[in-house]
Amino acid sequence: MQTNRFEHPLNEKVRIYLRLEYLIRQMTHASQLSDQWQHQIFFRALFDLLEILDQVQLKTELAKDLEKQRCKLKNWLNIDGVDQNALLELLDSMDMAHHKLIAANRLGQDLRDDRFLSGIKQRFSIPGGSCCFDLPTLHHWLHLPLAHKQNDLSTWLSQLTEMTDALNLWLRFTRESGPFQPQIARAGFFQHTAEDASLLRLQICPSYGVYPMISGHRGRFAIRFIPFEEGATIADTIEFKLAIC
């Protein structure tokens, strides 16, 4: 059965992690295409990402969070029923990602120092500011041979590798820490406790014609399902699956 999946952070740090993951996915997808309009999406996502990195001390916080996860995983060693080989492999991956993150320069600094990127970044903050008369440099680049552009895009993405690897590991472990459980919302409303949780994951069948509005924090959260179509009625009961991570 097809389901729509939603995620909701329960603290500001996880909110930032999810936004970074979202932007990196946009960049990765756009970098693999030949369409110049997709390449402009790459730049917009990249500059949004750099804005976030300028506002938060991500490197320190992400390194701390990865180390906390590593300590939790170590407690599973020698526990019956745990795949020790898979666990050791994951611990090795975390050790490597943590080491590379700590050893890395300021996150995104090479991208900030790039002459071409720094020359076009400011115009992307203006609505419609990437037109050819605003950014002739960009439009020259957009018409370079595809191999040249893909090499540039790959280079820029690679300068975020340490952050991306650490972030992906942390989010993977966090998502896998909470299994999906069936739940029922009555009159479109559901609430529950979430002690020490950092992320909610929700699956719902699109045939209900609703989307979730989620509010909450580490201690408690509420979900209200809203009809997508104006004036539509909502089912008395809505079955969905929820993971508290």
From Swiss-Prot:
Disulfide bonds listed in the record: none
Q: What Gene3D superfamilies would the database entry show?
A: YacF-like, YacF-like domains
Q: Which UniProt keywords apply?
A: Cell cycle, Cell division, Cytoplasm, Septation
Where does the record say this protein resides? Cytoplasm
Q: Which SUPFAM superfamilies match?
A: YacF-like
A single Gene Ontology biological process assigned to it is:
FtsZ-dependent cytokinesis
Q: Which GO terms describe its cellular component?
A: cell division site; cytoplasm
Q: Which residues form a coiled coil?
A: none
Name a Pfam family for this protein.
Answer: ZapD
Oligomeric and partner information: Interacts with FtsZ.
Give the family this protein belongs to, as stated in its UniProt record: Belongs to the ZapD family.
What functional role does this protein have?
Cell division factor that enhances FtsZ-ring assembly. Directly interacts with FtsZ and promotes bundling of FtsZ protofilaments, with a reduction in FtsZ GTPase activity.
Which named protein is this?
A: Cell division protein ZapD
